[in-house]
Amino acid sequence: MELLAPAGSMEALRAAVCNGADAVYLGADTFNARMNARNFSAADLQEAVVYCHVRGVKVHLTLNTLVLDREMPRAAELIRLAASCGVDAFIVQDLGVVSLCRQLAPDVPIHASTQMSIHSLEGVMEAAALGCSRVVLARELPAEEIAHICKKSPVEIEVFVHGALCMCYSGQCYLSSVIGRRSGNRGQCAQPCRLPYGYGRFESTRYPLSLKDNCLAGELDELRRMGVASIKIEGRMKRPEYVAIVTRAYRTVLNGGKLMPSDLQELETAFSRQGFTDGYFRGQTGSDMFGRRQEGEDTADLFASARATYEQGEPQRIGVRFYAMIRRGEPAQLAVEDPDGNLCRTRGPVPEQAVYRSLTPQDLEQQLKKTGGTPYLCTAVRSSLDPDLMLPASAINAMRRDVIAELTAKRGRAAPARLNAYDEPPRYDGIAGEPQLTIAVRTAGQITSRMLSMKPTVLYVPLSELAEHPDLPQRVSVETQLAAILPRVIWSGELAPVARQLRTVYEMGVRQVLAGNLGQLHIARTAGFAVRGDFGLNIVNSRAMRYLREQGLDSQLLSFELTLPQIRDISKAVPAELLIYGRLPLMLMENCVMKNRTGICACQTGTVRLVDRVGEEFPIVKDPGTCRNVLLNGKKLYLLDKKDALRGMGLWALRLQFTTENPGEIDKVLMDYQGRAVFDAGSYTRGLYSRGVE
């Protein structure tokens, strides 16, 4: 099982390698989810790959952000550079970047980032079909789900075992971008989840979105038995000393050792938020998983000890064999071989006739084992010596240094990379004329007579609501297509009831599904449904749109992190939909904020609202069909008065999305859309369509 450690800087990389990492993951100056880390320039990247490969450590490059069309040429340059440097894998979020990696550097493995929100075997299967050789699972998964996925997965599985936990499923958090233009999907998360929030205007503030750090140091044997290929430590923003301490602890356990209470205390002192949690892994969510960063104990001595592990000397981690031949009248010969079969040779001086003492195999071995200060450990010496010869120790040492230097150069030399030229995808201008109307609701009770009379092209209804209202297909016009909204998270163990509901609505005549992640896409197609893509797929570029076209999607809702000019310019390889009204979904949460407040589930009794430091209220509702929470924006997105400006952008449809609205409020919005009245949206937002994100 691979130990994968973070490297936010060259110093952190050395800390990881010297403390037992099998692989490191790092980011370049651009296109990685930790843009506030020190990261690596082109020269740094080359140095890092050489340093790691010499020591038998793999390097995974993070390309795990969303990439805009105008940025694709720069992303292509980085991919080609990294491949030529010899990186061992790309960690990718964006579907368009996956396509780009496969085109430009087809021999470099692609790992599906946790930012892809993959949380089921179905999502893993879709990622494998996409060309990924490894999937990093969502942190929220319990042990039984991980075991099920590992048992049937066609690709390697990677699991986070230590470090920060986000309250939201990775890749589905828009809180930082919507309230401050700093997008987590672009590597700029401002971590507003770590701030205090109240449960109402008159309640004391708490930290209901701030989770403790994950720690699965005691679960590694279980993960190994499951078949997990790689365990991952979070922390590219952390100090090198932290990386050293945590990597060393997990290496100790992987090597069969046990962590003492003092070791666990060191982990907590290095960094924690009021302790650690294994709640997600154990399936035990709740209020005891939450904590916040506080000033802890003095770390000076602990960090000084950690620095010594990578600043003083170098661990000898690569076993090598030496082969020596000392013949009378011939130059001395020495060779060294590493475990990968790299063989390097050199010649030395002609040995002299011994006068006092002959060179023995023991003398030779003693000199050849002096590999201190290098990453190599001499494990064996084989020699063939003629008798009564003398060779100075200085000559043997010089030969040893020569072959070691040549071996180091060979191990650090990148294999020739197969690189292809960059090309732009074909452009599709989209649909001319007036965009269609689509409507999404949270409950069947929100479907009003006025809504049905407007004959929206598509009416999106949660799958569970559709299954419970078999009369809906008869109520809608033949000009309106019903589409089932799948639960945003469907663990493999939750698939059976979803499959039953899909069969039910199929028999009702529903033939379309709205999918927001790869797992949903797989489930829908397997069940025989046409697929429309939702915002959770995070589509921000033309290459991703082309991928969706290849997958046969009927339409795609573009990311609400795009600006209107970017929406205009993106290739409409599939019919493009735009959200113009509704509360933006900011977080999708496995932990129930409602239940954590009082210990009682409040899903059916009302809406909980979190209040931030400036008094902004954020409603929390449950994702239909599940008990998962969705944090909504306090302000409604409102672009109904901008419909004319949206013509000529190639859009297929404009979507109205209703969440907390009652039927009366919904009808007022619909009348506004029709131009029959002006809806007082109150405190509304134009979203990110004009502001954009960093």
Language model feature labels by segment:
Residues M1-C18, A23-R34, A48-V49, R55-A83, ...:
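Surface-exposed amphipathic alpha-helical tracts and adjacent flexible/coil segments at the periphery
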Residues A37:
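A short acidic, glycine-rich active-site loop
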Residues M116-S120:
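Conserved phosphate-binding/catalytic loop of the ribokinase/pfkB sugar-kinase fold
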